[in-house]
């Protein structure tokens, strides 16, 4: 199904609201599934998404206020250069956590033969008193700015937060030199013992006009 950018923008505007509760995030995912099947998340990444905390993803904006995305919000590509910062609210512990970001729509939502693209993978995140996550080690995969190709519909970019298991720093399935294409977050999570994500959010980014 081909969806115009204008239609996607209208739906994205409908879900721009303060993510004040887990129910708000789950409702955004659910509403996206009802109205735009292309935006449904858990089925496309084969992972059980039943969050118990809130993940906030904030992009710096030179000369302007940072943008904290709300589940389902569409951002201009030039607002996603990043790297973003992460915060968590409602988590049972202060970490450590693993953060992952994937694009299940590459090269296009209708023909995602390169999906998933791994846009970020990092561990050893711990929360300070305000919930802001800090990381003292290099990411496994540094943040890659969304770059959907010309002519594509908007892509979904999904951010997931996991509790970090012991031994995660010793995993070798994904390294800084591993291809970012055809990544499978569900398979990776199972292989390294991440379990299911405890929080998540997503945004839409369309090609530059």
What label would you give each PLM region?
Residues 2-17:
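Cleavable N-terminal signal peptides of Sec/SRP-targeted secreted and luminal proteins
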């Amino acid at each position: 199904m081909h969806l115009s950018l204008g239609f996607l923008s209208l739906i994205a505007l409908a879900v721009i609201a303060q993510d004040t509760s887990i129910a708000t995030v789950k409702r955004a995912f659910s509403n996206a599934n009802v109205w735009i099947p292309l935006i449904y998340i858990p089925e496309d990444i084969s992972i059980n998404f039943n969050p118990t905390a809130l993940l906030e993803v904030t992009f710096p904006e030179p000369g302007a206020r940072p943008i904290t995305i709300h589940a389902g919000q569409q951002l201009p590509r030039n607002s996603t250069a990043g790297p973003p910062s992460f915060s968590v609210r409602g988590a049972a512990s202060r970490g450590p956590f693993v953060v992952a970001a994937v694009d299940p729509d590459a090269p296009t939502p209708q023909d995602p033969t390169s999906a998933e693209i791994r846009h970020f993978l990092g561990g050893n995140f711990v929360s300070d008193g305000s919930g802001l996550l800090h990381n003292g080690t290099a990411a496994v995969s540094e943040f890659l700015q969304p770059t959907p190709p010309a002519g594509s519909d908007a892509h979904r970019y999904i951010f997931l937060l996991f509790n970090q298991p012991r031994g995660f720093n010793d995993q070798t399935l994904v390294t800084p030199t591993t291809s970012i294409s055809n990544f499978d977050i569900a398979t990776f999570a199972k292989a390294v013992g991440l379990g299911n994500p405890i929080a998540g959010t997503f945004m839409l980014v369309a090609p530059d006009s």
